[in-house]
């Protein structure tokens, strides 16, 4: 039976890597106040409580561009391009348009349960962007668009996943918004041998 690799709680040593991302941290941290927890309880999908609660300044790219009154030809478009590492010569495995919503949950989607007692049952998928990697978590990370002082910015946040989220081959801290820039590459484990897919954030 397959065993997912897990690290003990709070044992990652980010060291210099953590400092690398300090300039990309946003001032506003996730809301874990009582009111935020109450909102979290009502935030569920398929009966599963979602870890991520959107911030007050969440906005979709489409709504932001509408707010500015921009014509289609003048708008910046956002997408997530996913490649299977061993099949890059075949082109992208999937493309996701990121313009219509303010956030996208990324997580495991295998089509079957990892529990051997539930092999015949269909896996419950809560992710908006599903990745068929057994070592990734159901709620692995989230891509979040925000209106930060009038400027549209996109962030990634690791949702305290089992094996971490890497941005350009560096493990990012959990539960912190890290700004994404066009061409950034995300992988869903800090262990290179676990990563069959690369997620590339693009804006054009």
UniProtKB/Swiss-Prot annotation:
GO terms for molecular function: mRNA binding. It is found in: Cytoplasm; Nucleus. The lineage of its organism: Eukaryota, Fungi, Dikarya, Ascomycota, Saccharomycotina. Its main location: cytoplasm. It comes from Saccharomyces cerevisiae (strain ATCC 204508 / S288c) (Baker's yeast). GO terms for biological process: maintenance of RNA location; mRNA export from nucleus; mRNA splicing, via spliceosome; U2-type prespliceosome assembly. This is Pre-mRNA leakage protein 1. GO terms for cellular component: cytoplasm; nucleus; RES complex; spliceosomal complex; U2 snRNP. Pfam families: FHA.
